[in-house]
Amino acid sequence: PILDAVLSLKYYTMEHKGIRFEHSVYLPTAFPLSPLDTSTLFTNILDNAIEACQSCPAAPWIHLDIKPKGDMLLITLSNSSAANYRYNKKGNLLSTKDGKEHGYGLRQVARVTEACGGFYQVTPSADKFTITIALPVSLEVERNNL
């Protein structure tokens, strides 16, 4: 239910901003995140995508794909991008926002992902940004729910 609430709220925001949103969501019976971590993860990746789309003048879009694969839940979010990326000396992405209140989104994604034994990868390109998140799904819990 919390994922539905986050997606509905962000869909409304995207619609209001003229961003095309496509999604495909297949959830396992044993969802690997708490409601708080679910909200944190999806709010951050969707907010980042919405912000990036605002710098794309023509036909901004976001695509979200959530599906189980083996013992992992794969979350892939891609969005149109104007490629205005900033990096630190280590090659890590930096926030495009100014001020100390900004730049926590990817750190929160990393915290949530790593806390449950998962990982994430970002793939910025000239016209698209993709984040792929893999979260382990407990097969024992899933079998017990059958």
Where are these regions (language model features)?
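Conserved ATP-binding N-box helix of the HATPase_c
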Residues: 35-58
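Glycine-rich/acidic phosphate-handling loop/turn and adjacent ATP-lid/helix
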Residues: 71-103, 142-144
